[in-house]
Amino acid sequence: MSSSLKIASTQEARQYFDTDRVVVDAVGSDFTDVGAVIAMDYETDVIDAADATKFGIPVFAVTKDAQAISADELKKIFHIIDLENKFDATVNAREIETAVNNYEDSILPPFFKSLKEYVSRGLIQFDCPGHQGGQYYRKHPAGREFYDFFGETVFRADLCNADVALGDLLIHEGPAVAAEKHAARVYNADKTYFVLGGSSNANNTVTSALVSNGDLVLFDRNNHKSVYNSALAMAGGRPVYLQTNRNPYGFIGGIYDSDFDEKKIRELAAKVDPERAKWKRPFRLAVIQLGTYDGTIYNAHEVVKRIGHLCDYIEFDSAWVGYEQFIPMMRNSSPLLIDDLGPEDPGIIVVQSVHKQQAGFSQTSQIHKKDSHIKGQLRYCDHKHFNNSFNLFMSTSPFYPMYAALDVNAAMQEGEAGRKLWHDLLITTIEARKKLIKAGSMFRPFVPPVVNGKKWEDGDTEDMANNIDYWRFEKGAKWHAYEGYGDNQYYVDPNKFMLTTPGINPETGDYEDFGVPATIVANYLRDHGIIPEKSDLNSILFLMTPAETPAKMNNLITQLLQLQRLIEEDAPLKQVLPSIYAANEERYNGYTIRELCQELHDFYKNNNTFTYQKRLFLREFFPEQGMLPYEARQEFIRNHNKLVPLNKIEGEIALEGALPYPPGVFCVAPGEKWSETAVKYFTILQDGINNFPGFAPEIQGVYFKQEGDKVVAYGEVYDAEVAKNDDRYNN
């Protein structure tokens, strides 16, 4: 396997070795593409910089006096080239080349290493995929453009499992299982499964392995639609819902502290199944969002302590996190770092959507299983059973580059180097928040305003990256406006860069006279080349990963400050939102930016939008269950459905779940009756589409028809008359 690693050398040290490799200047290098560093012994800045990466790069120090090198520097040096003795540039070259090869061998994880070796062999293919290394694409102009756009390597790495050299990804053997075992060690799991198809596929795998028809499932109402669909609609689990928070800004909060009370949970379970509610462990599975889309992250140790004894298994859906165990102050949020699990505790499953904020191609995810402490018990799900479900959803034609991305991700998180990546990110984003707070007044980072008697922005950055006090949701604090949080229950995920926009009084949580709805901010940023993750009401979210740099964050801050100035000056809308204005000039002709802000803010205010959004996830306002989600799914498959307009849908049983996307959380689940609250909320969305073209959200499970000059929303509901007269199922 040929190596592409370079050698980083200072100018003075370059004369003391020969090499056929590319040599780059060690000064200013980030050392990610080099296999060795060569410097004079007194060039300690270079030696220290290489050591600070924690990559373990071999450093060669050239010296005329080996005795003069300090003990501290010796710890950072791999080998000394001693000029006191007669040096031989060729010998030095061999030593350096050996070190580079050994280093590369150590940094490449098992599957990716094997994939590189396999591709380098240039085998003649007569198997799948049909493009056979990209050669088919090269025979047509469109195909050639496609081939050239992605580059040769990705096509040559798109392989078929007809050759078992890389191991079978479905039965977990060879380099494939070696990669999963390596990831399990990195993440502190008993077993790890690499999943293609996103965390939706991972959730399908977990729930189909654990939930059978009729099982009780303790269910976080914030769960992603994939969990509703797989655990309830497909597997037949019966939900016991836990109510969750929304605040006036539109941020998604965690489960109410009171809902973790055992007595209350058993009372809720008794309404679904009085007998099972009395069992030692009423629930086959609990599914909890470890971190919400909007950065409320749980103390996982407390969750297990409070509800673990009621459940055979707990699945922590960690789609929006996964990095918590690599950040010291977040360790308590990692279910995989609970080290005192015993036979009475639940099995732990953690699903991670690696592609969201870790290093993975889109659709890469992984399942971590930590349940050896219940091995031998009837509730234990062994590998055979779990892999049976894995194979139900895993393609027999996996995309090997995606699998390799999961392998490389684990390598990147490992050890000191991985922890440093996340620490450096924290420093970058803390500094960015400070700059925005000090330079602007309109868009406020969603963090505590005061910590330990000092303004948040006046804290010491290094301390803030290690002290959870700066991120804690204090019980009852006005700044976050979440109700029902307990002491030390939740904190802000520091890797969610969340901003609030004007329009909500932070003291009362009420609407103010003027506001800037976040969708306006999001559209402005997109017009200026910056893509946020999502926005809702008066909140906007940016996902932070180790990809961020100070320059990148400064570009974001600059555009936010520019928008603030434009709003303060009441600039023409045509100047502020050119794309939306051009597409809807008849509607917005002559508008200024403040006029649009005012109209949209008043629309949300007059409809009391955040109140209805909040109620959707409160037990008092949960839709009544008309049939089980599994039954609703069966009725929909049988075509026992009818399309009903929103203004006539209240009380009808939904056969499809309805939700805005993002965040992908059902407001009405399959089998639930459309409630007054749900109808009102989706009516607000419908009216927003009609009144403010260009700002339409993506909505799933609700269908829109153009009727005259208006868009009208419809939903698929149960048609009892059709079901009654369907002779296929009434014999």
Swiss-Prot record:
Reactions the enzyme catalyzes: L-ornithine + H(+) = putrescine + CO2
- Enzyme Commission code: 4.1.1.17
GO terms for MF: ornithine decarboxylase activity; pyridoxal phosphate binding
Q: Name one Pfam family in it.
A: OKR_DC_1_C
The transmembrane residues are none
One GO biological process from the UniProt record? amino acid metabolic process
**SUPFAM superfamilies referenced in this protein's UniProt entry, alphabetically:** CheY-like, Ornithine decarboxylase C-terminal domain, PLP-dependent transferases
Q: How does it assemble?
A: Dodecamer.
The record ties this protein, via NCBIfam families, to: PRK13578.1
Name-wise, this protein is: Inducible ornithine decarboxylase
Which species?
Lactobacillus sp. (strain 30a)
